[in-house]
Swiss-Prot record:
Residue ranges annotated as Extracellular topological domain: 161-215
Source lineage: Eukaryota, Fungi, Dikarya, Ascomycota, Saccharomycotina
Membrane-spanning ranges: 140-160, 216-236
Bilayer topology term: Multi-pass membrane protein
Taxonomic source organism: Saccharomyces cerevisiae (strain ATCC 204508 / S288c) (Baker's yeast)
UniProt-listed GO biological process terms: localization within membrane; protein-containing complex localization
Entry keywords, A to Z: Cell cycle, Endosome, Golgi apparatus, Membrane, Transmembrane, Transmembrane helix
Record's protein name: Golgi/endosome-localized DSC protein 1
The keyword NAD appears for this protein: no
Length: 294
């Protein structure tokens, strides 16, 4: 009887763990979608509120799209990995008259009769897929962190003069409430409201009370976009990438199936993200040195 109860409890815990992992993946997908949507909202609000350039909007939207779904499928990466290897293979064909010619891209006879070549090719393809994913991750890291840091530095070094369209006629009361219409002087203002580029006019979006408060809000938007994009990058390119990140195991047994809301969706250690990128750079340097020495 005790053996039956212990077996039933073991089967129940295994079933709960399986359902728990399925619920966890579902929550992870929802988390990625929500972070991606939040990033698009912040990028759009910054463009609308502070009249950022269209190129800034397009660049950040492209980066946001790439880090939301960073890697192609393994099947596509495997085709890319085997493309160069197939081009380097040559096969020998015998023409009438006994003349032999090598054809590039043709399987050699030694590959056709070697049973171990398939397993070796599989290992080589897996290594190539991991290498390509790490190269993609390194590129997106610079697009996510380096590009956002560049925008922040440029925003601090070159602040926006929000009162330039007023031509020195700054109001003394609580903000520019009754600025003349742009249809008479074309100063880029409409009753104190900003007129953005690309035929965009936000009704009710007034000028800030001072240049300091306006530029401070812009810097806060820049940091918010940086935090959201770097968190999304850490989630999609490190934690959920199945490359070199090992999620810490739970000390307590999984007694829940995830439907009670007790689910640890993901742990996002930002310091391990930096370590993973630095390790990718060291591995690439070692591979280049090894290839040069050969």
């Amino acid at each position: 009887m005790d053996n039956f109860e212990s077996t039933a409890e073991g089967n129940l815990s295994i079933g709960n763990k399986r359902v728990y992992e399925l619920r966890k993946r579902n929550f992870q997908r929802n988390l990625v979608n929500n972070l991606s949507f939040l990033g698009y909202v912040l990028i759009s609000l910054e463009y609308i509120k502070y009249d950022r350039t269209v190129w800034t909007l397009i660049t950040r939207a492209i980066v946001q799209s790439l880090i939301s779904s960073p890697f192609p499928s393994d099947a596509k990466l495997r085709r890319l990995a085997t493309l160069g290897a197939d081009n380097n293979t040559t096969g020998v064909a015998t023409l009438p008259g006994g003349r032999s010619i090598r054809f590039p891209g043709m399987f050699g006879t030694e590959m056709l009769y070697n049973s171990s070549s398939e397993a070796e090719q599989q290992d080589h393809d897996d290594t190539a897929i991991v290498s390509m994913k790490k190269q993609i991750r390194k590129f997106l890291f610079h697009g996510c962190l380096s590009l956002n840091m560049l925008f922040i530095i440029l925003t601090i070094l070159f602040p926006i003069d929000f009162f330039e369209p007023l031509s020195g006629s700054e109001p003394v009361d609580d903000g520019p409430k009754n600025t003349p219409s742009p249809f008479s002087n074309s100063d880029g203002l409409l009753l104190g409201e900003r007129r953005g580029g690309l035929f965009l006019q936000m009704i009710g979006e007034r000028l800030p009370k001072s240049n300091f408060s306006g530029n401070l809000g812009l810097v806060m938007f820049e940091f918010s976009i940086l935090i959201v994009q770097f968190t999304l990058f850490s989630l999609t390119c490190v934690v959920l990438a199945d490359l070199d990140f090992e999620e810490p195991e739970r000390l307590e047994p999984v007694n829940s199936d995830g439907y009670d809301g007790s689910v640890i969706v993901a742990r996002i250690p930002l310091n391990k993200t930096m370590n993973a990128i630095l390790n990718d750079g060291n591995i690439n340097d070692n591979n280049e040195n090894a290839s040069n020495s050969v």
